Amino acid sequence: MQLYKKYVDVVVMQRKTGELRPLYLCWNDGREYKIDKVLSHSRKESCVGGYGIRYVCIIQGRCRNLFLEKDRWFLESYQP
């Protein structure tokens, strides 16, 4: 199966240290998904192209890669 970049809105907390912590994903139709836990974050290349900060997150019990690429957020998704 082919992976795609799915750009999403993200609600983020920025700590006084400058660290960003994603809290929620927001879909175009208004649905919001709480990010239950951020397991790690580091600079990585995405399988779908691009390079940025990869946040390995638990969202509704599933492990997902959420990327911050310059000033936009995307998920690696099987649906465009």
Region spans (language model):
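Cysteine-centric segments in proteins
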Residues: 1-80
